[in-house]
Every structure is written in structure tokens, then in C-alpha cells.
């Protein structure tokens, strides 16, 4: 069965898993999802993730969620650019999330990265999601 918004599905699984105080959540694997998870791991929003093969050609990602003193580290995670409404931004037009406490994840010509990395590399792109 095809999925209209795979990244939106990943973000919803993370959001629902943290609301239910799950330690791990599982999602179908794709390179975009893995790249977004790598940014979340690097920025300290998740403990980590692992890719496992269910059968040849079908893989899944197991995501270890992170909590601090019993509270989810991710307070809010939301999709900005959707399949029906793509949102692109120059680096100068990119706004800070939660007064700099959160991050924006971008898909740029140099790969998927956080807004701080995009600012240092001076590159804009598609605004995938915001996390804080």
C-alpha cells in the first residue's frame, strides 16, 4: 500500500510514541527518514535508531526515544512542507524555532541538515519539519 506522506507518518509515530511513554517506535525504512533521524540524533532529540531487514527489500527503522526526568525531550514536532504544499526557504528568510531553542530540519542540495548547519554552510532548501 502506498503512503502519501512518509515523513509525516514518521513524525506522527515519534509524537504518538512519546505521548504514550514508549521507549522505542518502529517505522518503515527510507533514506529520507534515516537522514531526518540522523539529524534528530545529532541534535540530541532521540537516543538513536537502527535499521533492520524484515525480508529482502523490506526494512524498518527502530527509533529509541529520549526522555529527561520522565518528560519527552521532544515537546513538539511538526511537518512544515507537505506533499501538497512545498515550503522552500532561503537561509536569510529562515526563522528561529522557539527563540532558538528548537531546530528546523531542511532538505538542501548538500543533504538533510538542521538550520544551524544550513546557516554555517549558507545554504537554503525545503523546510521539512520543526522540532522543539
UniProtKB/Swiss-Prot annotation:
Gene Ontology molecular-function annotations: rRNA binding; structural constituent of ribosome
Domain of life: Bacteria
Annotated Pfam families: Ribosomal_S8
GO cellular component: ribonucleoprotein complex; ribosome
Alphabetized UniProt keyword annotations: Ribonucleoprotein, Ribosomal protein, RNA-binding, rRNA-binding
Gene3D superfamilies registered for this protein in UniProt: 3.30.1370.30, 3.30.1490.10
Keyword Lipoprotein: no
A biological process term (GO) from this entry: translation
SUPFAM superfamilies: Ribosomal protein S8
NCBIfam families documented for this protein: PRK00136.1 (NF001109)
UniProt subunit comment: Part of the 30S ribosomal subunit. Contacts proteins S5 and S12.
Similarity-based family: Belongs to the universal ribosomal protein uS8 family.
Function per UniProt: One of the primary rRNA binding proteins, it binds directly to 16S rRNA central domain where it helps coordinate assembly of the platform of the 30S subunit.
PANTHER family: 40S RIBOSOMAL PROTEIN S15A
Protein name, as recorded: Small ribosomal subunit protein uS8
Amino acid at each position: 500500500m502506498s503512503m502519501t506522506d512518509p515523513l509525516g507518518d514518521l513524525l506522527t509515530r515519534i509524537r504518538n510514541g512519546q505521548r504514550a511513554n514508549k521507549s522505542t517506535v518502529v517505522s518503515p525504512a527510507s533514506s529520507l527518514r534515516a537522514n531526518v533521524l540522523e539529524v534528530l540524533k545529532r541534535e540530541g532529540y532521540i537516543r538513536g535508531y537502527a535499521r533492520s531487514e524484515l525480508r529482502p527489500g523490506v526494512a524498518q527503522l527502530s527509533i529509541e526515544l529520549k526522555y529527561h526526568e520522565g518528560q519527552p525531550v521532544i515537546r513538539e514536532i511538526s511537518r512544515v512542507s507537505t506533499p501538497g504544499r512545498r515550503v522552500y526557504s532561503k537561509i536569510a528568510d529562515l526563522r528561529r524555532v522557539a527563540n532558538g531553542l528548537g531546530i528546523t530540519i531542511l532538505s538542501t542540495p548538500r543533504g538533510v541538515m538542521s538550520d544551524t548547519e544550513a546557516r554555517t554552510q549558507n545554504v537554503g532548501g525545503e523546510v521539512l519539519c520543526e522540532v522543539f
